[in-house]
Curated annotation (Swiss-Prot):
Keywords linked to the UniProt accession: Ribonucleoprotein, Ribosomal protein, RNA-binding, rRNA-binding
Family statement: Belongs to the bacterial ribosomal protein bS20 family.
HAMAP family: Ribosomal_bS20
GO terms for biological process, alphabetical: translation
Cross-referenced SUPFAM superfamilies: Ribosomal protein S20 (SSF46992)
Protein name, as recorded: Small ribosomal subunit protein bS20
Cross-referenced Pfam families: Ribosomal_S20p
GO cellular component: small ribosomal subunit
InterPro entries, per the entry: Ribosomal_bS20, Ribosomal_bS20_sf
Function: Binds directly to 16S ribosomal RNA.
GO terms, molecular function: small ribosomal subunit rRNA binding; structural constituent of ribosome
C-alpha cells in the first residue's frame, strides 16, 4: 500500500494506463484474428488487404501511444505482410 500522496496518485494513473493499454492490445489481437480469418476463409484478396490495413493501422496506433516498441510492431507487420503475400501467390497459382 502506498503511503505518500504521489505514490497513491501513481497507483491510480497506472491503473488507468493499464486499462487503456489492455483495450489497445485487445484491439490489435482482434484485428489480427480477423485478418487470419479472412485468409483462412479464402475471401477475395481485396477483403484480405482491407483486414491487413486495419491490423496494420491498429499496430501503428499502439506504437504511437507507447504500448508497443517500434521493432515489435515492425515484426508483427512483417509477419502479417508475409502471410498476405503467400496468400496472394497461392491464389495466383490456383488460378493458373
Amino acid at each position: 500500500m502506498p503511503n505518500h500522496a504521489s505514490a497513491k496518485k501513481m497507483v491510480r494513473v497506472i491503473g488507468k494506463r493499464t486499462l487503456s493499454n489492455r483495450v489497445r492490445k485487445s484491439r490489435v489481437r482482434n484485428s489480427v484474428k480477423a485478418f487470419v480469418a479472412a485468409l483462412e476463409a479464402n475471401s477475395p484478396i481485396e477483403d484480405a488487404i482491407a483486414a491487413f490495413r486495419k491490423a496494420e493501422s491498429n499496430i501503428h496506433k499502439c506504437v504511437n501511444k507507447g504500448v508497443f516498441h517500434r521493432n515489435t510492431a515492425a515484426r508483427k507487420i512483417s509477419a502479417l505482410s508475409g502471410k498476405l503475400k503467400a496468400y496472394d501467390l497461392a491464389r495466383l497459382q490456383n488460378e493458373q
